[in-house]
Curated annotation (Swiss-Prot):
Taxon lineage: Eukaryota, Viridiplantae, Streptophyta, Chlorokybophyceae, Chlorokybales
CDD domains found in the cross-reference section: uS7_Chloroplast
Any one of the GO BP annotations: translation
Keywords, sorted A to Z: Chloroplast, Plastid, Ribonucleoprotein, Ribosomal protein, RNA-binding, rRNA-binding
Span of the signal peptide: none
The protein, known as: Small ribosomal subunit protein uS7c
Coarse class of the protein's main subcellular location: plastid
UniProt function note: One of the primary rRNA binding proteins, it binds directly to 16S rRNA where it nucleates assembly of the head domain of the 30S subunit.
Domain of life, per lineage: Eukaryota
Amino acid sequence: MSRRNAPKKRPISSDPIYRSRLVSMVISHILKNGKKSLAHRILYQAMKNIEEKTEKDPLKILQQAVLNATPLVEVKARRIGGSTYQVPREVKPERGTALALRWLLSSARKRPGRDMASKLTNELLDAANEVGNAIRKREETHRMAEANKAFSHYRF
């Protein structure tokens, strides 16, 4: 790891259709092998599907899904005196959002089905309703932090 200064955060530009930074972040997380136009198509199709199914603003549902999947605490391994402890720590907002997006997309990819747009639609709707694999992952992370609360004095 570099001992120099931490790199500056690049500003995330908002997407052209929804004018939202969150949508741009989701597109960047969907991205595989540099095919950004495909990532755009997948997300916009998923948003259209959400609007057809719920007749609500898809951006609000996306925001709710990400908010519900965002963890507040996580555990980090810390080696002390020959044994490794799982030390709970708070999650910064940027990291929480990144984790939520990662979990939502990995859960969507694992779902059965043909196209990614429909799988992403179902995962986002489930997460907005506080069910689904991404929510389960967040709950599991919170349980781990709660179980290892005794080691919280080993700060980083």
